[in-house]
Amino acid sequence: KANKYLHNILGLKYSYNKNDNKDNKKDPLAIFKKVKRQRYTIDKDVPVYDNSCMKEYTDLPYIDWVREGVMPFACKRFNIGYSYDRKRIVIPERKWDGDDNEYIGISGRTTVPNYEMFDIPKFFKLSKSYPKGINVYGLNENYQTIQEAGYTVVLEAQKSVLKRYSRKDGTAVAIGNCELTEEQVRILISLNVEIVVALDEGIDINHIRQECDKFYPIRKVSYIYDRWDLIKKGSKDSPADMPNKVYNFLLKHRVLYDESERRKLKDWQEKQVKN
């Protein structure tokens, strides 16, 4: 008020914005805030599809996927198809706790070369609904193996699960991106097994620790981190893209997320806030 009074006496224009005094410092946590956080609630009205949802697609594996290591028997188990009209690999996603004939949705992955140049989306929803955030891909098919092994490896992409299954490894699941939703965390906790977080190359180690922290200390949790540069830098490849020998090495030398790891995360967070 005093400032406003003095401005009036001197005939000066008075303006004040309460945000003017705030520092315009770069937010050190911006990299994490860029990830869109979504909260998912279980909707009893979410439709569940049966095998008829795949009738318009060809029941054949895509040859380039076979060359990459996704075997026909894996495609058959996960009911992978192909759409000639849309030029997309058809990927149905079974409900994690449903029957073999229950799907929550279908996505199509383009096979068009240089699709970015033509503004063609890499993935496209082929079903009316597809609430990925309330499901964990591959858990329906791999549940028994995961229980027997006592752990599950959480990957990003559906194809990564298919690659591991092609190598006779039924412990992998996929969450669809690099951040677990609250519902996916609840689903994985319910398995009562070790959770191994294995995100793609290039993901910051502190982001990985944040994902591990969602399970700690309720479940034993660990993470795969390539300290040996076995995965090409800048490739954004998944550990599942590596030869089986490399993948097993990374899995064997996974890092247990414990109090020491958690302290590193908290120290980093505090340091970023101070800066």
Where is each model-derived feature located?
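Short flexible/disordered coil segments
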Residues: K1-L10, Y143-T145, G150, Q210-R219
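Short, flexible coil/linker elements and helix-boundary hinge sites characteristic
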Residues: G11, N79, D119, G150, ...
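TOPRIM fold recognition
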Residues: K163-N275
